[in-house]
A protein has these predicted regions:
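A structural signal for well-ordered alpha-helices, especially hydrophobic packing surfaces
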Residues: 28-32, 50-53, 57, 195, ...
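Extended ligand-binding clefts on enzyme/binding-domain cores
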Residues: 1-25, 40-139
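Short, flexible helix-adjacent loops and helix caps
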Residues: 36-37, 58, 172, 203
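Inward-facing hydrophobic residues that define packing positions of alpha-helical scaffold repeats
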Residues: 28, 108, 154-158
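C-terminal capping/lid segments that line or modulate ligand- or cofactor-binding pockets
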Residues: 78-98, 134-206
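Inter-helical turn/loop segments and adjacent helix faces that build the functional surface
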Residues: 30-43
Length: 206
């Protein structure tokens, strides 16, 4: 499925976004489950979308390790990128792949690596930004809470002032103070949800 907008509402480089198509897959699965009489056939269509993602959105790096491209043109072109409002890090959370999936693991390693343009891996707030706001995003911290980096994310939360304690779009990578998007209400809601989900995992582990 084609789109010209990324999760930030910025225009995409190529027309087919991996993350957006995963959302299409998830929505079709949900509709088929909730309304089987009306939309049961969407289960087959969802599987077709899933197969298409693996067929067209997976590439290999210089070491031949597979990873998910961010956007593709179906002609072999793609870009390596991620956006905190709709991150490839959330694929296991949506049930698209397992947390130990090799392709997903390689993808996450690439976008969290110090060499990635919008990674702040070496900073106290070691989250990810994007072109829309090139600082660590609070939504990236939410993604960390949901994708296996909850210990790091909780530590970062303790260091952040944000917008006087209110969730904002992005923060300074060292100070944790608001840099863009003060009083970001939808971000605050997702942060609460992510913290709750991560806390459940901690309590179950105990």
């Amino acid at each position: 499925y084609e789109t010209f907008l990324q999760p930030t509402d910025d225009e995409s480089v190529y027309p087919y976004l991996t993350y957006n198509n995963v959302l299409v897959w998830r929505a079709m699965k949900a509709l088929a489950h909730l309304y089987p009489e009306q939309y049961g056939t969407l289960e087959q269509q969802a599987e077709a979308v899933r197969r298409a993602i693996y067929a067209h959105c997976v590439f290999r790096d210089a070491e031949q390790k597979p990873y998910f491209g961010w956007s593709v043109d179906l002609k072999g072109q793609h870009n390596v990128y991620d956006e905190p409002p709709g991150s490839l890090q959330l694929l296991p959370y949506y049930g698209f792949c397992a947390p130990d999936d090799e392709i997903w693991g390689n993808t996450v390693a690439m976008i969290r690596a110090p060499s990635y343009a919008y990674s702040f891996a070496d900073a106290p707030i070691a989250e990810i930004g994007c072109a829309h706001a090139p600082y660590p995003w609070i939504l990236s911290l939410c993604n960390s809470l949901l994708c296996g980096y909850k210990e790091q994310a909780f530590r970062e939360l303790e260091q952040m002032e944000m917008d006087n304690g209110i969730a904002c779009e992005s923060v300074d990578p060292v100070l944790g103070t608001c840099t863009t998007g003060a009083a970001f209400a939808t971000c605050a809601g997702f942060l609460c949800h992510s913290m709750k989900q991560a806390s459940k995992e901690v309590s179950h582990a105990d």
